[in-house]
């Protein structure tokens, strides 16, 4: 699996052989917590799509997933995320089903139904 930092507010996931790598276009580009958030959504979505594709006997050739986000203020936070999957080998008749499957990602559901977060000092 390869995660590429495609911008300050974007990542791309591409399935590759071997261990997961995180790549940046330059050494000064840092993998931020926001890149981690986008990566977790991309990886989770890939996982459910890959599982579905395996059971449906569909090829994932050429698949990639892009996630972009924007910020809001007061308080400073991620305001929205946009996930786009590119799947050239997906039969057009399966596109709507693939979108439904992608929405079943647990990270996606967590973002739609935020958990309670407790902060404590030890």
Model-derived features with residue positions:
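Extended beta-strand/beta-hairpin segments
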Residues: 1-39, 49-122
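Alpha-helical metal-binding/catalytic segments enriched in His/Glu/Asp
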Residues: 44
């Amino acid at each position: 699996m390869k995660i590429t930092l495609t911008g300050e507010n974007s990542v791309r996931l591409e399935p590759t052989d071997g261990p997961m790598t995180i790549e940046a276009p330059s050494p000064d580009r840092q993998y931020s917590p926001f890149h981690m958030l986008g990566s977790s959504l991309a990886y989770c979505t890939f996982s459910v799509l890959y599982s579905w594709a395996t059971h449906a006997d569909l090829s994932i050739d050429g698949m990639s997933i892009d996630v972009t986000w924007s910020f809001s203020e007061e308080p400073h936070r991620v305001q929205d995320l946009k996930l786009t999957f590119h799947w050239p080998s997906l039969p057009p008749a399966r596109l709507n089903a693939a979108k439904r499957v992608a929405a079943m990602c647990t990270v996606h559901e967590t973002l739609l139904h935020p958990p309670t977060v407790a902060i404590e000092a030890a």
